[in-house]
């Protein structure tokens, strides 16, 4: 069973889905069909979760799916920590119609949100928060940030 909450903001509306086993049962087709997708996965997220997501996305006929696994900590939540994400997007010629997916906790959702907001002046983003704090804070509300010190 899942619940959907529609969030309305001045810059645009979005949907928050809440439930268990959504990755394996959600119909992603309207979001991913014929699109390039980059999943940025926190290294602490079990590979089984990534595979469930990858299978579900593949059933929705994307153009391609790439995965980048990153180490997350307050040190990597920086400009330098973002470089590998930008490099994968650029090396694979991801365009403005691509989709970025953040799979992990609050640091991951902050980093991926920052990249989505700045790559090619903004690309589509799906956040899949995997910790309680990221589910109630970091992945919701449209805020994102990195450390600069």
Question: Model segments located where?
Answer:
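Acidic-aromatic/histidine active-site loop/patch
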Residues: 106
């Amino acid at each position: 069973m899942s619940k959907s909450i529609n969030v309305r903001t001045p810059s645009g509306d979005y949907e928050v889905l809440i439930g268990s086993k959504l990755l394996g049962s959600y119909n992603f087709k309207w979001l991913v069909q014929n699109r390039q997708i980059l999943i940025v996965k926190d290294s602490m997220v079990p590979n089984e979760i990534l595979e469930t997501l990858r299978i579900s996305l593949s059933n929705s006929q994307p153009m391609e799916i790439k995965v980048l696994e990153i180490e997350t900590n307050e040190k990597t939540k920086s400009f330098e920590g973002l470089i590998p994400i930008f490099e994968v997007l650029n090396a694979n010629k991801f365009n403005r119609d691509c989709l970025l997916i953040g799979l992990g906790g609050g640091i991951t959702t902050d980093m991926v949100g920052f990249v989505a907001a700045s790559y090619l002046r903004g690309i589509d983003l799906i956040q899949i928060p995997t910790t309680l704090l990221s589910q109630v804070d970091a992945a919701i509300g449209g805020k994102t940030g990195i450390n600069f010190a």
